[in-house]
């Protein structure tokens, strides 16, 4: 099981406010919360997210289903993590074969934080895909 994170904003052309929008997918569930993201907590997440999870756990802990716990993080948290990921070597078969317990952030390289815009250009998604 992999890690999924998502961050996006939705603009309503009528009143300029955010509108609830849930897209059903096998891999993703999107939140209407602007410039925030949810990280699924599992043992592949590196120590940075682990510490963030413990620090924010009391106020931000949210359960989305029976066995998966997410923690809410800000866009700045995601940018800091992306900088950490960018300093690592590029993903390769060799990198992916490294022991995830010794090199946990290598696992994150298979899903690079990216920007996706819909056809109308009104919605922006920042998503790290499952592996």
Model-identified regions with their sequence ranges:
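Acidic (Asp/Glu-rich) sequence patches and key acidic residues
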Residues: 1-123, 129-131
